[in-house]
């Protein structure tokens, strides 16, 4: 049996699609699964148990990347094609079943929308990541707080200085995670965005995990953390999918669509709503700076405490 799974370019959207992929992999354990995704997200799927092939979709002018993907896939007859990009590809290939993501609904979380593609919108499978077996000694003591201070757009980016203050509070001897180490995650290309965080932390208090490896490596390191706090980003969704207690910071993005998914997740947002932020006079996403200034360190620390208390109460 052959399954073609066409998913997102962006890491966060690709992570959110892993729930339905995991469902298909479990339902058809002997299937050969081919995953097509953008270069930023493709390594998420390297450890998928049923994986047959990965196809990197490098964006090309005039949509030529779709022609390239068709050429890669046309010689096979697919039992199932799942297209989460709403392209015409599925209708140009031989397939037993075709599942195309429906149009987005305003109030539907992305996980629910993705699940509705294969008829599971009422009971959406949670995103999941597949960790490689490791021979490393993972018995090191002490707690770790994962901090992800970058974002794919400056408007969504809380200031690195505030992240540093928050990290200091959470890891203080009397903090929520007393004497925890700070694990800082970002892509290597984002180092300049997060440098101010390093500049404001004691040098012996953190692990610099910027650009540490591909996304499978990052997932392994994230899974060893006790708590995650970061902007609305792919790393936030990875942490949630790994079952790490996850607090997402939101401003100019919709929590109803992209809040971290799972029982150990929460979010805190600016006092201004998404509509108030993007509807403000003079707003232009191309030229704006950070739109997260209305979110205070006090508010984020309080949200972290509330999330930890809620998780502890529910266990």
Where are each of the predicted segments found?
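Catalytic machinery of carbohydrate-active enzymes
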Residues: 1-315
């Amino acid at each position: 049996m052959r399954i073609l799974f066409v998913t997102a370019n962006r890491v966060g959207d690709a992570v959110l699609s892993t729930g339905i992929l995991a469902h298909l992999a479990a339902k058809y354990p002997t299937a050969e699964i081919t995953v097509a995704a953008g270069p930023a997200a493709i390594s998420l799927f390297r450890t998928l148990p049923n994986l047959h092939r990965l196809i990197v979709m490098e964006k090309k002018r005039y949509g030529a990347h779709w022609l390239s993907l068709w050429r890669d896939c046309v010689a096979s007859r697919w039992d199932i094609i799942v297209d989460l990009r709403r392209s015409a590809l599925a209708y140009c290939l031989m397939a037993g079943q075709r599942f195309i993501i429906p149009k987005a609904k305003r109030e539907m979380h992305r996980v629910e929308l993705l699940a509705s593609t294969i008829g599971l919108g009422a009971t959406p499978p949670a995103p999941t990541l597949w960790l490689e077996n490791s021979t490393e000694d993972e018995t090191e003591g002490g707690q770790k707080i994962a901090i992800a201070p970058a974002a794919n757009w400056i408007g969504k980016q809380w200031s690195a200085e505030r992240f540093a203050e928050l990290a200091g509070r959470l890891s203080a001897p009397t903090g929520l995670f007393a004497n925890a180490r700070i694990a800082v995650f970002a892509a290597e290309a984002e180092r300049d965005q997060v440098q101010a965080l390093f500049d404001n932390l004691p040098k012996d208090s953190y692990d610099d995990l910027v650009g540490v490896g591909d996304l499978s490596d990052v997932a392994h390191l994230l899974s060893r953390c006790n708590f995650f706090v970061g902007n609305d980003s792919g790393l936030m969704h990875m942490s949630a999918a790994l079952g790490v207690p996850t607090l997402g910071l939101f401003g100019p993005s919709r929590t109803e669509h992209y809040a971290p998914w799972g029982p150990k997740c929460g979010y805190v947002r600016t006092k201004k709503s998404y509509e108030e932020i993007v509807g403000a006079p003079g707003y232009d996403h191309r030229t704006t700076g950070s739109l997260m200034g209305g979110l205070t360190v006090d508010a984020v620390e309080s949200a972290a405490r509330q999330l930890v208390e809620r998780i502890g109460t529910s266990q």
